[in-house]
């Protein structure tokens, strides 16, 4: 199954995340198919940028967002249906 999920990047105790499409069997920070955006919770205000067209295209093809990504997409106004 293909998932839309967060890939952890950055230094120790200073993480930021890339929003990627990856096979559910690959490791969290491992191989991914495509990068869709990024999320940085350490900045004030929190930085979140995503390509809504790519997200919707992947979801139409059957990709499932993780719970965290789903919450972030809902907050930003990108539809998750």
Swiss-Prot record:
Gene Ontology terms for molecular function: structural constituent of ribosome
Any one Gene Ontology cellular component term annotated for this protein: cytoplasm
Annotated keywords: Ribonucleoprotein, Ribosomal protein
InterPro entries the UniProt entry points to: Ribosomal_bS16, Ribosomal_bS16_CS, Ribosomal_bS16_dom_sf
Biological processes, Gene Ontology terms: translation
PANTHER family: 30S RIBOSOMAL PROTEIN S16, SMALL RIBOSOMAL SUBUNIT PROTEIN BS16M
Family: Belongs to the bacterial ribosomal protein bS16 family.
NCBIfam families per record: S16
This protein's name: Small ribosomal subunit protein bS16
Organism, scientific name: Clostridium acetobutylicum (strain ATCC 824 / DSM 792 / JCM 1419 / IAM 19013 / LMG 5710 / NBRC 13948 / NRRL B-527 / VKM B-1787 / 2291 / W)
Recorded name of the encoding gene: rpsP
